[in-house]
């Protein structure tokens, strides 16, 4: 049993430990109790496919029993029209598409192993596909991930059931989604209306959802339909996304419009990127490398049979949400069906090699910096600013949302500016509120009217220049609160100077008072701050993207502050 099969086995075994089995009301048996969310998640039927994979692999009946258990429990959220509620108290039904995908992949690969229950699974699956055919069209009020997912689902339905109507809608949805590609080759539309444009001209881009859900589904559709032109377009999406895969296998979603679900390895409720990349390995060898590195990161974030929501969750004492495990178990099973295996020596990815470069992404108002061993993002992304107060407050304002060292790993990774559950049933809460703090680099001022920060100014202006081996990015803005109100007389300038092995940050703040500080949370122990300012430190953690950090809080003097980040082990 190779290491990846063992990983899937550990996930399946972990899920079985949390499966409800012996309630007197047998209709409630079969779901997984979530140790993080203290409830059951309505999409637990997504575990059927990986459980059937493990049954086929081991012939251990416990996996098939678990698969039938989640299938039976789904009746608790299954409507008479065969659409599915997201949860027992959440009326969203778009997730019907993920149930259909899981059942179709089970039927295509393991119908015989379902035994005398195959017909029941097939009947429910076909009824779901009929609902999706009629309802989950381009007119459905949803983000593009659902349209993309249904393109893949309908292609699978055509492959299994053979009905041309499924092929036709899959093709239509695929064509529609492939119109939502930015000038830099990224899929957009991860907000509704899908073609929305911000004041700055940005579109709705979320790397986590793109790489783990939308683009894999589009690839399924293109390959099943056998459309070489569309396959080539999806391949370009896969290639463009690799500019956001960090050398350790993580996905950089530090700026994403849905980064409230960023887990460093991906996103909280999607299936994963490995199968899509591995499926295309013969067309581009770096795709296999991407798949392997991401699975290796998932393995490092797995403890006691569950996938944790970030690299430091387990160490900090946070519980694992089972949603991560049953979704990514489906994705890993998909990759294993294709034959994926670990390799000791993989190839290279775009961000592996040290270089000196700067690239601007206007669709996300973000500069990507490569400076020697350092990778950084400086962002002024303003998409979704009206929903910041609802818990979607990704970094903006000229924030350095990511700093990664090719030698030492992640150094800075922006969280939400204020953690609020935008999707209460898909996000967990911490029991350690005192130390749960933003991981975002920022100027911050507090007064009687609240907290104002540079990381929330969606109107900040960025400029950048490269002079031989030195890159400088400057941001100018005004401290802003969560509701979008600007603090009078609180204009700021942030200047980032990147050299091959260090970063210097100079900050200026008009009318800086005693309540104004620069906060720099550093992840790991490789980076060292040198400053003349008073520097107060404490240990913090944030659920997004799941890191422990040392928070440095530095005081302004005469409205100015400067510090240098250098590296040592």
Q: What positions do the PLM features span?
A:
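Surface-exposed beta-strand/loop patches in extracellular or lumenal glycoproteins
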Residues: 514-525
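Long, contiguous hydrophobic alpha-helical segments, chiefly transmembrane helices and signal peptides
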Residues: 67-70, 74, 94-95, 148-151, ...
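Beta-strand-rich recognition/accessory modules
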Residues: 537-569
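Short aromatic-acidic-glycine turn motif
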Residues: 525-535
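A generic secondary-structure signal for well-formed alpha-helical elements
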Residues: 107, 158, 181, 241, ...
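Long, well-ordered core segments of solenoidal/helical folds
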Residues: 3-31, 64-83, 120-140, 164-191, ...
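Extended polysaccharide-engagement surfaces of secreted carbohydrate-active enzymes
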Residues: 228-231, 243-515
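Aromatic-lined, polymer-binding surfaces characteristic
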Residues: 36-56, 60-230, 258-266
């Amino acid at each position: 049993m190779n290491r990846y099969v063992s990983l899937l086995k550990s996930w399946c075994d972990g899920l079985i430990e949390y499966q409800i089995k012996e309630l007197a009301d047998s209709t409630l048996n079969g779901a997984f109790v979530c140790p993080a969310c203290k409830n059951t998640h309505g999409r637990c039927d997504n575990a059927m496919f990986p459980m059937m994979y493990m049954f086929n692999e081991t012939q251990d009946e416990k996996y098939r029993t678990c698969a039938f258990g989640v299938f039976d429990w789904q009746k608790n959220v299954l409507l008479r029209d065969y659409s599915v509620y997201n949860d027992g108290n959440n009326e969203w039904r778009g997730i019907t598409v993920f149930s259909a995908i899981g059942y179709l992949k089970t039927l295509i690969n393991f119908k015989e192993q379902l035994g005398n229950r195959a017909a029941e699974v097939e009947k429910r699956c076909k009824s779901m596909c009929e609902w999706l055919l009629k309802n989950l069209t381009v007119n459905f009020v949803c983000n593009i991930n659902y349209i993309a997912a249904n393109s893949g689902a309908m292609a699978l339905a055509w492959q299994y059931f053979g009905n041309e109507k499924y092929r036709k809608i899959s093709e239509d949805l695929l064509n529609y989604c492939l119109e939502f590609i930015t000038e830099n080759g990224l899929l957009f539309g991860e907000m509704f209306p899908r073609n929305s444009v911000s004041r700055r001209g940005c579109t709705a881009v979320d790397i986590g959802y793109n790489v783990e859900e939308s683009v894999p589904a589009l690839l399924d559709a293109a390959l099943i339909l056998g459309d070489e032109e569309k396959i080539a377009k999806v391949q370009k999406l896969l290639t463009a996304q690799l500019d956001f895969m960090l050398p350790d296998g993580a996905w950089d979603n530090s700026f994403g419009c849905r980064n409230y679900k960023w887990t460093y390895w991906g996103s909280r409720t999607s299936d994963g990127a490995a199968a899509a990349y591995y499926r295309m390995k013969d067309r581009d060898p770096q795709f296999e490398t991407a798949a392997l590195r991401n699975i290796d990161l998932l393995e490092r974030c797995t403890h006691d049979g569950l996938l944790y929501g970030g690299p430091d969750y387990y160490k900090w004492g946070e519980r694992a949400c089972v949603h991560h495990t049953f979704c990514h178990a489906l994705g890993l099973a998909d990759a294993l069906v294709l034959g994926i295996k670990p390799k000791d020596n993989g190839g290279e990815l775009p961000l592996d090699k040290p270089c000196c470069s700067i690239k601007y992404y206007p669709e996300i108002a973000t500069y990507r910096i490569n400076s020697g061993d350092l990778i950084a993002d400086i962002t002024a992304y303003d998409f979704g600013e009206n929903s910041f107060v609802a818990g979607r407050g990704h970094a903006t304002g000229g924030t350095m949302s990511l700093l990664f060292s090719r030698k030492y790993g992640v150094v800075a990774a922006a969280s939400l500016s204020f953690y609020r559950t935008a999707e209460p049933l898909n996000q967990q809460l911490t029991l350690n509120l005192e130390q749960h703090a933003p991981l975002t680099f920022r100027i911050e001022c507090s007064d009687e009217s609240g907290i104002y920060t540079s990381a929330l100014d969606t109107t900040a202006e960025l400029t950048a220049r490269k002079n031989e081996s030195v890159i400088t990015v400057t941001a100018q803005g005004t401290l802003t609160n969560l509701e979008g109100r600007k603090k009078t007389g609180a204009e700021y300038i942030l200047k980032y100077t990147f050299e091959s092995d260090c970063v210097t940050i100079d900050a200026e703040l008009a009318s800086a008072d005693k309540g104004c500080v620069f906060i720099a949370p550093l992840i790991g122990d490789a980076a060292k701050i040198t400053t003349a300012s008073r520097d107060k430190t404490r240990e913090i953690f944030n659920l997004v993207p799941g890191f422990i950090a040392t928070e440095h809080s530095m005081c302004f003097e005469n409205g100015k502050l400067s510090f240098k980040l250098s590296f040592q082990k």
